[in-house]
Curated annotation (Swiss-Prot):
It comes from Ehrlichia ruminantium (strain Welgevonden). It comes from the Bacteria. It is a single-pass type II membrane protein. The chain crosses the membrane at residues 8-28. Heme binds at residues 120, 124. It is found in: Cell inner membrane. The keyword Iron applies. SUPFAM superfamilies: Heme chaperone CcmE (SSF82093). GO terms for molecular function: heme binding; metal ion binding. This is Cytochrome c-type biogenesis protein CcmE. GO terms for cellular component: plasma membrane.
Length: 134
């Protein structure tokens, strides 16, 4: 019987270590998932007061205003829109009508972005291939 209990003890310890490892890995992955909210979700929730929110949407045409120290534009999810203020260099794919993800926080009804990521669709093609008929 002694050998049976020792084997059971080893199996329980091994399963416990494995379960603990899975919990740690999933906990670390949770922090790296790039989830974003739409303007409608952000405006209709208590997330407005949280720092480091990611918001995604389309840049509204005709709203991009460039100043000496910042860029101001609106993003929409085709239901609501939010004014975004960004200080920094915009990604090359940023343009009116393009989809972006902005990371930042809400301050006085404006979204102050610390980072802008431009999205492209799955049909992206480099400029050198766009002019050639393939």
């Amino acid at each position: 019987m002694k050998r049976k209990y020792r084997r059971l003890f080893v199996v329980i310890i091994t399963l416990s270590i494995f379960a603990g490892s899975v919990v740690l890995v999933l906990g670390k992955l949770k922090n790296n998932v790039s989830f974003f909210y739409t303007p409608t979700e952000l405006l209709s929730s208590s997330l407005i007061n949280r720092p480091n929110i990611r918001i995604g949407g389309m840049v509204v045409k005709g709203t991009v205003q460039k100043y000496d120290d910042s860029i101001v534009f609106h993003i929409t999810d085709l239901k609501n829109y939010i004014k975004v203020v960004y200080k920094g260099i915009l990604p090359p794919l940023f343009s009116e009508g393009s989809w972006i993800v902005a990371k930042g926080k809400m301050v006085n009804g404006k979204f102050i972005a610390s980072e802008i990521l431009a999205k492209h669709d799955e049909n992206y093609m480099p400029n050198k291939y766009k002019t050639n008929d393939l």
